[in-house]
Amino acid sequence: DPNNDYSIPYFWGTVGIVYDKNQVDIEDLEREGFEIFRDPKYRGNIYLYDSERDSFMMALKALGYSMNTSSEKELQEAYEWLVSCVQTMKPEIVTDEIIDNMAQGRKALGLIYSGDAAYVMAENEDMGYYLPESGTNLWSDAMVIPANAKNPELAHEFINFVSDYEGAYDNSSFVGYTSANQEVMDTLYGEGGEYEGIDAYMPRSGYPKDEVFEYNEDTRKTIANLWSKVKIAASNAE
C-alpha cells in the first residue's frame, strides 16, 4: 500500500543493534555493522531475534545485498552467513524477552526493533542503539479495515481514536514505539519528553540504503525454510 490508500500507520521505525556501552566498542559497530554478530570478541554474548525476515535482512545487508532480493545465490549466501554466526558465536535466539534482558544488561548486544530499543534505553542509560551504514529495514505498523468488515463505521472511529493526539500519545509513551503522529513524536522526543535524547525513538529516515520490505510469497517460503535450518544448526552447535 505505497500510497496509504488502504492503511493508516500508527507506529514506524527501524531494526538495529542494541548494545551495552560498557561492553561494546562503538568503533567495532562503526567498522563492522551487522558483521559484529560474527566478531569472536562477543561470542556467547549476543542475542539474535527469532524472525526469519529480520535475521535474513541482517545477513543480506551485511553482505551488501538488498533485503528484498529473490536471488537464490544471494539467499544461500545469507543462509551460510547465519549458519556461520550460530555455529561460532553461540547466540541466544529470542523474541520479546530481549527487551527486559537487555534492559538488565544480560548480554552485550542484540538485534532489536527501534521501539524496543527506546524502552531499553529509557530503562538503562548504559544502553545504546546503532544503525549500520549498510542499511536496514524501515517499517511501519498500520491498521486496515477488511472489505467484509461488519461494522466499518465503528472501525473508522477506532482508527480515529488511535490516531488522534491523546490516543497516539498514550500508545507511544507506554510502549516506546515511534508514533506516526508528528505532534506526538515531537512531544515525546523533545525537551521534557519521556524519550528526550533517546536516538532509537527518532528513526533514521531518508537514508538511501534503508529499505521497506516488498512481499514475495516464494521468497518468504524460501527464507522460512532456511531459517528453520539455521535454528537446527544453532541447536547442534557446540
What annotation goes with each model-predicted range?
Residues 1-4, 119-131, 193-196:
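Ligand-binding "clamshell"
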Residues 76-85, 123-147:
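Periplasmic-binding protein-like
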